[in-house]
Amino acid sequence: MISFFSSDVSKLPLCESIVATLCLIRPDFPADVVTKELQNRVEEARSYVISEKKIDGKLKKLIELFYSHWKFGSATGVYKLSDVLWLDNVLKTRKGTAVSLGAIFLHIAQQLHLPLMPVIFPTQLILRCDEFNKKMWLINPFNGETLDEHVLEVWLKGNISPTAELYKNDLKKAQYLTVIRKMLGTLKNALIEEKNMELALNVSNTLLRINPNDPYEIRDRGLIYAQLECNHIALTDLIYFVEHCPEDPISEIIKIQIHSIEKKKFVLH
């Protein structure tokens, strides 16, 4: 199990870090099953790409295997967002998000010694390889398709702002810890939306192990505690946020929440 205080998570394999982190959050997370499944996928992929000698050929074969034969991809229809983030479920259903699919694909690629890296683009995680004809090769982890600058600019203008522009910094390699934080943030919000407050609290506490003094995460934990009617703890967290971020417009809303909690009878757990 990872200690965020004594280990440099960014130096561990991404999937290994995610599996260990999910064990902190979900006591029943089947780490051994997930690890074995990942090993099996790696061995199958190794056999599938063995005929290719060049890096770009191996990567193209892996994309073919992952998306066309194994049929990993984005979820459709009605589904719970948390289901496409838990790695055990993603491996079972083969449906995931850009982060969960990207983490699995990246794990397999790295075991095959393919020079792939994660990029936290403003709209989603993407994968990057710099060895293809010495030119940056960008891959959409949802479907394995190659991304070009035009597509990325369309994403920015459609999701961020009509005046948004693509900058070189948007395509820099992301540290694994940054990827994990992004995944956990999405998982936390999904669990809150699904009213699974106990697990959401576990996610929030895990995020605070990574960055113990983050006032925004402390605020979110306070709001989760309020939902769980742990009002005395909720107040401590919410007051911390207001004191540390007095200029944030959200502080006024949080003050109303604090006042509402103070009017209630404390429920001690």
Describe each model-derived feature in a short phrase.
Residues 1-269:
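A structural boundary/capping signal
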